[in-house]
């Protein structure tokens, strides 16, 4: 009990971080050219941020800022972000609705992708429906081009900010599996 009380007092004096959605919306204007004003990009070159878990978004912004995740396009945007900026942006994009985009999934690829997802146990982390949780991203409805890009980056170990889980899984999948998984994941809502 003597140890718990001082620890409790310490936490009582720490400032609580609260996200400001209105501030997040204003800050997101700098993101709109690539990610869309509401986190729904016009092209598969960039990820859908709308509806993504706030914790995941915050951690990715932090990783970009601190150099644990590399993407030259992101570097100038994250360089001057404060912790509060990142919290505001994460909560703003998490609160937005992902919109469907034009994508004609190949039924055979979707079936093969679903089978591969079951084999490598994707839903153990990404949950059923690939909705994500906390620091695990929502990947359902993500653009297939972006899914392919990220799976290839994990496989090539050029993206390693995942504590090793995706990097390990990616070593077990083929190029065909990557294409099939992208069709399956992109077909989900």
Predicted feature locations:
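C-terminal capping alpha-helices of c-type cytochrome domains
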Residues: 79-101, 145, 150, 171-189
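N-terminal signal peptide c-region/cleavage motif recognized by signal peptidases
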Residues: 13-14, 19
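Sequence/structural segment immediately N-terminal to covalent heme-attachment motifs in c-type
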Residues: 20-38, 101, 105-128, 143
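Protein kinase-like catalytic domain
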Residues: 35, 65, 126, 155, ...
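Sec-dependent N-terminal signal peptides
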Residues: 4-13
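Gly/Gly-Pro-rich "capping" loops immediately C-terminal to redox-active cysteine motifs
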Residues: 39-69, 75-81, 114, 118, ...
């Amino acid at each position: 009990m003597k140890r718990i009380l001082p620890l409790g007092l310490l936490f009582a004096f720490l400032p609580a971080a609260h996200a400001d959605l209105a501030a997040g919306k204003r800050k997101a204007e700098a993101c709109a050219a690539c990610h869309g004003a509401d986190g729904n990009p016009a092209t598969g070159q960039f990820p859908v941020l709308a509806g993504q878990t706030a914790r995941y978004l915050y951690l990715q912004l932090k990783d970009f800022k601190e150099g644990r995740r590399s993407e030259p396009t992101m570097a100038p945007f994250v360089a001057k972000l404060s912790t509060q900026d990142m919290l505001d942006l994460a909560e703003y994009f998490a609160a937005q609705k992902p919109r469907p985009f034009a994508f004609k999934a190949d039924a055979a690829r979707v079936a093969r992708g679903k089978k591969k997802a079951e084999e490598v146990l994707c839903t153990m982390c990404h949950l059923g429906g690939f909705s994500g949780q906390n620091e695990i991203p929502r990947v359902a409805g993500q653009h297939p081009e972006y899914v392919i890009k990220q799976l290839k980056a994990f496989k090539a170990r050029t993206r390693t900010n995942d504590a090793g889980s995706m990097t390990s899984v990616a070593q077990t999948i083929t190029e065909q599996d990557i294409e099939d998984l992208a069709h399956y994941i992109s077909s989900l809502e």
